[in-house]
Amino acid sequence: MKKNILKTMIFGVIGCLFTSCFSDLDTMPLDDNQLVGEKVYQTADGYTGVLAKCYSSLILTGQKGGDGGDGDLEGANEGYSSYVRLMFYLQELPTDNFIMPSSSNGLRKCLNLQWDESNASVIRWTYQRLYMSIAYCNEMLRECTESKLKSRGLWDQLGGECASYRAEARFIRAYCYSMLCDLFGNVPYIDENTGVKDIPEQWTRKQIFDFAESELKAIDADLKAPGTNVYGRIDKVAAWFLLSRMYLNAETWIGENRYNDALTYAKMVINDGHYPLASDYRTIFLADNDKCKEIIRPLVQDGLKAQSSAGTNFYVKAFVNGPMNELYNTGVGSRGWGNVRSKTTLVNAFDADDVTFDTNDTWGNQKKDKRAQFMTALPNQKKETWDDKDNMTSTFTCGYGYIKWRNVNQDNTIPAQGDAYSSIDFPLFRTAEAYLIAAEAILRGAQGTKEEALGYVNEIRERAYMSGKYAKDGIRSDVSGDITADQLNLDFILDERQRELASELVRRTDLIRFGKFTSGRNWDWKNGVRDGSDVEDHFKLFPIPATEFSNMPNLKQNDGYTK
């Protein structure tokens, strides 16, 4: 029911308002003297629609749905241009998780860690997508003020929600800046006070980090209490989670040890209790995952009202091919694209006995670790991502499929929205990661005991193995998954994050934090060779897109790249 409320808000209001009105904001100048799109703000629904656009900008691609030809990003392939799909290309493809052999739009450059400032369109589109989301949030903050609401006669209707609307827009903006900090380092800063003719100042990575941190702390009082907002919108816990993730990476990003803070905020997420671990890992990635209380920050999808070749539609269809639907219910029929397979390093992170797909046990109920969701049963399928001549190949059977994303409900039925597009909400933040953040922070020196860290890790592993309190009838639970204190170290945490969070847009960040992205660990096709080889350290950051320098000639490029 909650899910339907937000979807009605997003897709109904956006459909009515933004197709006709919000596009004006993309083409007309925004300044303090001329209220473009003024008709948007004449009703309370208009304001709700602008906030909805802030949210949906991270999962949808345009105004019409599907690949309707009215995408948000001018010149971008609409199917590619969803934030979630773009982030897969930047955060998963260059790592030890997945292979996608396509050469279009710079994907091969991302896979091989051989990009530059102009040879990978997906890098430019990611940069633009994040700034577009920031622009939507800035627009909301300009217009959702007490004085403007009163001047439009809307204060009585919206005054009680004004503070929370603003806080949510500031959260989304802070999240976008945190990702720009992660991906690009020193980037231009714009806010609601930046004029249309102003040339944005390029801030240092620390300035961007400090801004996002200060915003997340400042909005705490105005965000909804944990668990009280409608499904799909954020509350205080989302801000705590994002702070914990930022603090975990602070030493890498800005040279500051903030592990105590990472632990503090991760424990706030865990101990609050409104977002408990799901009892079954596999349910987090299904079409009815709006029932899953573990998801703190879902990016809402709907097979009818949020159609796109991006979003989780990509995560289902790109990861399967047509014949796989004959072996298990993919939820998309024979519509699989056959693009993405697992690298050998991801497969090897799991016990070999758990990797094999059993056609008589398609959910993997008899596996020890239920996270080992691979397709190994196609004819002539092999683990290696290369052919018999050691060449990269687009043949889908060279490499195992990864099948944790399924467009079906928990009872294995197709969702009511059908099987043409995915109805899986993307779990951008979920509580299991907070457990792993807490454990890692302790191992890096935060004020906690190793026994405490071990408890966090074993809680995750017991859930994965469905042992102890997670045991269910008919599902294997005789192996606990628990490890000992002697087994727990940072290398184990990195591997456990791979097992738990593969495909969830954090792997590049993890490898960099552990010092194993450019060197220290190799994988299939890193630097363009079969077994991988080291690359230069400047690949820890993506380049500022070359197209940005024509409008901002004083912009400084990241080291190792040219303008």
Residue ranges and their predicted role:
Residues M1-D31:
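Bacterial Sec-dependent N-terminal signal peptides
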Residues C181-D182, P188, N249-E256, R444-Q447:
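Short coil/turn linking the two alpha-helices of tandem helical-hairpin repeats
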Residues S20-F22, G79-Y80, L86, L90, ...:
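Long, intrinsically disordered, low-complexity segments
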Residues R124, K370-E462:
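C-terminal substrate/ligand-recognition segments
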Residues F22-S103, L107, F209, K217-A218, ...:
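An aromatic- and glycine-enriched ligand-binding surface/loop that stacks and positions planar moieties
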Residues R166, R173, L243, A250, ...:
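Structural register within alpha-helical repeat arrays
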Residues T43-A44, T48-A52, S56-G62, P94-L183, ...:
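Conserved, well-structured interaction surfaces
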